[in-house]
Amino acid sequence: MRKRKGSADHDSSFTATLTDGSSDLKQCHKGTDADTDPGGSGKEMGRRCRRGGLMWRLRRILIWLLGIYIAIPVIIKVCPSIQAKLVFLNFVRVPYFIDLKRPQDQGMNHTHNFYLQPEEGINIGVWHTVPAGMWREAQAKDAEWYEKSFQSSHPVILYLHGNAGTRGGDHRVQLYKVLSSLGYHVVTFDYRGWGDSEGSPSERGMTSDALFLYQWIKQRIGPKPLYIWGHSLGTGVATNLVRRLCDRGTPPDALILESPFTNIREEAKSHPFSMVYRYLPGFDWFFLDAISANDIRFASDENVNHISCPVLILHAEDDTVVPFQLGKKLYDLAAQSKSLNGHKVQFIPFSSSLGYRHKFIYKSPQLPNILSDFLRAPHPHG
């Protein structure tokens, strides 16, 4: 009986131990669950912290961008000379590694580089490209030969380039080649402050340089036709120049405007650079008045009322730098000009599908026919 009682006590003790063990296991599981919950909460808090940090960084970036956005017009208003640099972009030299003294490096083997002095202390770089038919004869010739070549029967085009770059810019060189192949002498130059020309840029200085070159050419070609071709900002210089010549009673034989605008204020307002500020209250006061403060106008819309020679306007519909509508508006003004009454005024649009944009009209296979039709003369090939 004692054994059975002992056995019962042992069983009871074992059961109690097992029960206690189960209780401990339960406590262990509870502990594990408790440990798991805080871990999940920690991860969630970590994710929230990371999201909060990211949002804070984004807020800081937005604040910086807003500060810059506000600061730029204020800086330009306080320092209007900055706006002049943005109009001229003469400090942008593309391609940079080009020796303007060696036009042959650009494939211009019938081009002579030289320098002229429109006023004391200012030397400007000039290129003279002879007609392609004179290419062989032009090889290794000196300045005297090139100057005498003006005595040929070929007409001359004075080319006035736009802002940025130099007279050696690729799209400009390609146009010289096209015009040379059509039998024209092409004379082009870098305004003061551009390329290897001395001095600082200004509208008055650019126009004076163009007038000096025109007179220099005219003295050497006699009665032969002399046409003025302006591109982009160069159209503003061209209309300034032609207005002066017409006021003197000595108009050029024709004026060709490629991708022109009406005036610099309208062009600046339409330029892609102004897109982020165009609808800002006070845009004119901050940006456009800063241009006027530098005495920069390029008022072609006013100049056409004083021009008395044939005018041809070329403009691509997909031009994003000088919008097509500005060229069309200038044409409409020119067509109504009393001073142009009796002179041919023609507007040639180029479809967007052609992809000529701002500076590739030279690629048009129709360009030779357009020029010969406008100038009322066949091209002087050879």
From Swiss-Prot:
GO terms for biological process: acylglycerol catabolic process; anterior lateral line development; camera-type eye development; monoacylglycerol catabolic process; myelination; phosphatidylserine catabolic process; phospholipid catabolic process; posterior lateral line neuromast development. Residues 13-25 have a biased composition (Polar residues). Disruption phenotype: Morpholino knockdown of the protein causes myelination defects and functional deficits, characterized by progressive ataxia and motor skill impairment. A disruption of retina architecture and retinotectal projections is observed, together with an inhibition of lens clarification and a low number of mechanosensory hair cells in the inner ear and lateral line system. Residues 1-12 have a biased composition (Basic and acidic residues). The keyword Signal does not apply. Residues 1-45 are annotated as: Disordered. InterPro entries: AB_hydrolase_1, AB_hydrolase_fold. Glycans are attached at N109. It is an enzyme of class 3 (hydrolase). Residues 82-382 are extracellular. The keyword rRNA processing does not apply. It catalyses: 1-(9Z-octadecenoyl)-sn-glycero-3-phospho-L-serine + H2O = sn-glycero-3-phospho-L-serine + (9Z)-octadecenoate + H(+); 1-(9Z-octadecenoyl)-sn-glycero-3-phospho-(1'-sn-glycerol) + H2O = sn-glycero-3-phospho-(1'-sn-glycerol) + (9Z)-octadecenoate + H(+); 1-(9Z-octadecenoyl)-sn-glycero-3-phospho-(1D-myo-inositol) + H2O = sn-glycero-3-phospho-1D-myo-inositol + (9Z)-octadecenoate + H(+); 1-(9Z-octadecenoyl)-sn-glycero-3-phosphoethanolamine + H2O = sn-glycero-3-phosphoethanolamine + (9Z)-octadecenoate + H(+). Its main location: endoplasmic reticulum. Keywords: Endoplasmic reticulum, Glycoprotein, Hydrolase, Lipid metabolism, Membrane, Transmembrane, Transmembrane helix. Lysophosphatidylserine (LPS) lipase that mediates the hydrolysis of lysophosphatidylserine, a class of signaling lipids that regulates immunological and neurological processes. Represents a major lysophosphatidylserine lipase in the brain, thereby playing a key role in the central nervous system. Also able to hydrolyze oxidized phosphatidylserine; oxidized phosphatidylserine is produced in response to severe inflammatory stress and constitutes a proapoptotic 'eat me' signal. This is Lysophosphatidylserine lipase ABHD12.
